[in-house]
Amino acid sequence: MKKSICLFIGILFLLLSVSANDAYTKVSGGSILPLSKTKNENIKMEKEEINFTLYKDHYDINVKFYFKNYGPTETIEVGFPQWKHLQPTEDDFYYFKSKVNDVTTNFTVKELEKSEPLDEGMVITKWYIRSVTFESNEITTTEVEYSAPYGVYGISESADYLFGTGATWKDCIDEMIIKIMNTTDDVWINAIRIDNSDLGNIIRENNTIVIQKKNVYPKIESEIFLELEIGR
């Protein structure tokens, strides 16, 4: 009962403002992008499914991307960024997995000697890299899964996901589905923020919140931010 009430409260305050100075993300991830760092004008992200699973002492994220190649078949290196806010921390993912077309794939981890600036107060510290073949006029799926410690937001805690790196593909993200599942009565969702934008269609089912958005044009720093209160 306590958890359901808190989910309801979270929906009431979904548009709470968050600033980079208040938030301290220890480690998080983001949408995959072509490592050329230039916008790919042929391959479009048709859909992105982002699944948060909240536990008492950490959270898991599983993300599935659906791409369609409107140009000729091509194989490119794509990178999944690991990022944080500018704070003295050595935190890392507890684990990381990846798939292409539902098949588990190997990846290369690129440790950065010097962090790459992403935006004011945000830096990329590591890349998870793999080669993906995008067949012409076909849908290619890629999937990542990782586990991370909660970040800090004032006296509260936070969970984050950076979807702004999805801006490096053709046009907009046609559809974005965000699913937040709370597994414990020890975690309360106080607020959800998605890049100062309208949250689209919201569905609440028991201990799960589902948000559906269409035609998303992210900025490179666009993120999903959950403000949480955790009982100790």
Language-model segments: what does each one mean?
Residues 8-15:
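Bacterial N-terminal signal peptides
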